[in-house]
Amino acid sequence: MGEFSRLTGVFFEPGKTFADIAERPRWLVPLLLVIVAGVAFYFLYGQHVGWERFLRHQMETNPRVQQQMERIPAAQRDAAIAMQTKFMGIGYYFGTIVMVPLMYVISAAIVLGIASGMMSAGVKFKQVFAIVCYAGLPGILKHALAIVVMFLKSPDEFNLVNPLAFNPAAFMDPINTPKFLYTVAMSLDLFTIWVILLTAVGLKAAAGKRLSFGGALFAVVLPWAVLVLLGATIAGIFS
């Protein structure tokens, strides 16, 4: 399969495509595309909405932070916001360029440990890493849709943390809903589920008869569920 056929096949023929990816595990092109899409989205967000608006919104929706900021004199508060604004965009760019590949590596290693270590699937790290990179391609579509929504909405109404209404959290009050519940609901995102299913399809294709689709899905969902619950617990503690 050529690279273009792989990129389109992930969406239209995932089983056949991931079988080819497992046989010849290349990962650079999908990883670069995911990174470029993320950087483009955050660049346009910084230009159209602005990081100061995002920072103020985050403070307004977190009662604990809001109480802390109210104790600070207005001049010092504005200076602190201005300082944080300078580094906010850099942080998101860093997260996209550095942390996304790192998280892919960690995810691949964990899935490999479960699939091969616990289930004797016999897959290799290079295969799983390539599968994770290609399975992340729906993120490009998510960023593209988010850009469209961003320019259709007023900058004050656009929510960077949850830009699309493809999860239950989009229909919840972010201020009054318990942060644990809100974080879990936000994690149940259509694109996240899509990525999970693609990863499981890829893992099954790489393992062949040594692993069922249910087993592959378990190997992917287990670490994701643990991470979601951990993140939701932390969000609940610090809300």
Predicted features by range, described:
Residues 105-127:
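Hydrophobic transmembrane alpha-helix segments characteristic of membrane transport
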Residues 77-103, 181-193, 201:
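Individual transmembrane alpha-helix segments
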Residues 1-12, 80-84:
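Short, membrane-interfacial amphipathic segments enriched in basic
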Residues 127-239:
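Hydrophobic alpha-helical transmembrane segments and adjacent short intramembrane/lumenal linkers
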Residues 48-87, 175:
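Membrane-interface interhelical loops and short interface/amphipathic helices
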Residues 32, 94, 98, 102, ...:
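Hydrophobic residues within alpha-helical transmembrane segments
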